[in-house]
């Protein structure tokens, strides 16, 4: 969606900036994670059926849906940093996580799996759809990110 507003792909990271509020992050972490000491996996698939998001679920892990979990996505930074894995459809959450990771490297130790939309010409925040999988031309390559596309259109 950046290109629709004339923002170059490298500008979306270069000009991205926010001030962390670690006190708020800690409170949100306690509210969401609490005393549960299990490792957890975060996921966001607000558009079921529009992507091929499938991943193995292990009984040892807790699974937390990011959809509507907070009003301020930056309050979730500590929760994101401490996740075992993050699975996101190409959505708002994918864009926020990518920009934070590309600019600040906060999620370097967290495997992040990006699922493009499967319908032709269905725009996401990073990719267009699974037919454009080879055209993911981002200014920063992040080794902890993997595009998961089970079937091409």
Predicted regions located by residue number:
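Catalytic machinery of carbohydrate-active enzymes
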Residues: 1-153
């Amino acid at each position: 969606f950046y290109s629709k507003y004339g923002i170059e792909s490298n500008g979306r990271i270069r000009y991205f900036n926010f001030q962390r509020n670690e006190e708020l992050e800690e409170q949100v972490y306690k509210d969401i994670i609490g005393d549960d000491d299990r490792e957890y996996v975060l996921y966001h698939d607000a558009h079921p059926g529009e992507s091929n998001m499938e991943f193995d679920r292990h009984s040892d892990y807790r699974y937390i849906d990011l959809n509507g979990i907070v009003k301020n996505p930056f309050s979730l930074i500590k929760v994101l940093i401490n996740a075992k894995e993050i699975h996101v459809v190409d959505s708002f959450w994918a864009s926020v996580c990518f920009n934070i990771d590309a600019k600040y490297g906060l999620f370097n130790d967290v495997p992040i799996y990006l699922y493009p939309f499967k319908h032709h010409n269905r725009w996401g925040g990073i990719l267009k759809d699974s037919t454009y999988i080879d055209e993911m031309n981002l200014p920063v390559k992040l080794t902890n990110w993997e595009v998961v596309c089970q079937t091409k259109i």
